[in-house]
Amino acid sequence: MSNNSNNNIKTYYIIGIITLIFIVSAVIKNQLSSSNQEQQEEEEETDSMGKSKGRGNKKGKKPEKIQEKKLDNHLKNLEKVKLQEDFKLQQDEKQQLKKEETILVEKQEIVVDELKNKKDEEKQQQQQEEDQQQQQQQQQEEEEEEEEQQEIEEDEEEEEGQEQEEEEEQQEIEEGEEEQQEEEQEEEQFSMFGVSIERLMDFQRQEDENEGSDEVEESSKVPIVLSFMLDRIKNLNGFKTEGLFRVNGNLKLVEQLATEGFDPFSDDLDPNVNTWASLLKKWIRDLPEPLIPHELNPIILDFCTNNNINNTCNNNNDNNNNNNFNVCASTNNLGNVLNLSTNICNNNNNNNNNNNNNNNNNNNNDNNNNNNESIEKKITNIINMIKSDDHRNVLYKIGEFFGEMLQEETVLITKINVESLSKILTPSLFKPNNIIDDFSNGSLNGSGNQIPKYLTTLDLPSILLKQKKEIAFVSCLLNYFKDEYSKKLQEQNDQEEDNQEEEKDNQEEDEDEEDKDQEE
């Protein structure tokens, strides 16, 4: 805008100069024309005066005429000289004016040329500016097009990336769904019964890792199903139920719970404590590898032989036992038959006279008192020989449960003592040797981890008779855990007493301080 305004001012200035030149030239021409007219008028007047004087001289004297003529001639000469001078002046002025006109014209031409040059330069500048603007616009348009193209390419890349991510996410979702389905299928196929303790614990640890729980609680060292069954028996007042583990629950329901599983948070669980006690025995009995491994059987037998431990059913009632087993011959489930057989054995023991029982108990107590420390150490060593930590943890968990159950105040209610409980648990803890040998030789078509259900009861009398030493060891094991629980209770009681004494001492000290403060 500033360049355009300056150019306009210059053009107006040049136009003004040109108009002034034309005005000056017009004025000079008018002056020249007016001077020419004056000269003509003077000449006419002189002519008229000469004529009038000539006429007068003709009438006067001749000398006057001559003088007049001389004067006239002199005047004429003067006039001519004057006219010549005036003419020269006029010519000079005309030449000067022409020079000035030529100078003005030249200046005008120069100015016009300058104006043209300036206009041309301005046009060139404008053209250059327009060209530059066009180039800039083209560059901007090209850059914008490139940016748009880049944005389009980036959008396409993003869309491709998003599509790839969506495909990957879809694949991950599908893989996750497949894994979830596989896990669900595995969970559906995975049973808590008839499965090794190691596999149960691996599955449980995997679940804990998936949930992100790093802390290892005491209850998580054993299978959840075991902890639940033990807690369920306690919560249903099992320790206040007479005949616990001797009286069977609903056997069909036990089999159904073991086969189909159960929801521990359901409100429709069976409230009968005997059902859960039977389910616990079945879980122990169905373990592929017994809770006390087979390789420890020779050590256990040597332990029972060297310590003269005998805690079997009364041999005088063998015939009655055989007759009673024949009553159960129609039952196909070995677990149920074993439970019934232990009931018969316990009933026979209860029918023995009190004198024989007292004598046996006194003898056992004497032997236990004499060899208590050595037997306790040997049992501890045998338990420590179990290589699997998971097996040891499960054995201690079950032992702690039965140790609490065998406390004197509980035995008075349940009527289940160490002797009767050892006979109930032995068939579940120790699989009979003849069946184990048949399994190892492949002579029985079992599943490999459970005793076949089609096995009849005809072999049970001989099986139980062969487990006398195992029953004796289980009796020692139960006494061991009973004493351990008693020690634990005693420690807790001592700790509580110590805490109470400390509280009393603290209270007395506080009272003494208050008394001192009051006295002061």
Swiss-Prot record:
Bilayer-crossing regions: 8-28
PROSITE patterns attached to this UniProt entry: RHOGAP
Biased composition (Acidic residues): 140-189, 493-520
Topological relation to the membrane, as annotated: Single-pass membrane protein
Domain of life, per lineage: Eukaryota
Gene3D superfamilies: Rho GTPase activation protein
Pfam families tied to this protein: RhoGAP
Annotated site, Arginine finger, chain positions: 246
Keyword Methyltransferase listed: no
Biased composition (Basic and acidic residues): 63-73
Chain intervals for the UniProt region annotation (Disordered): 33-73, 121-189, 348-373, 489-520
Molecular function GO labels: GTPase activator activity
Main localization, broad class: membrane
Protein keywords: Coiled coil, GTPase activation, Membrane, Transmembrane, Transmembrane helix
Compartments reported by the entry: Membrane
Function: Rho GTPase-activating protein involved in the signal transduction pathway.
Protein name: Rho GTPase-activating protein gacV
Gene from which this protein is expressed: gacV
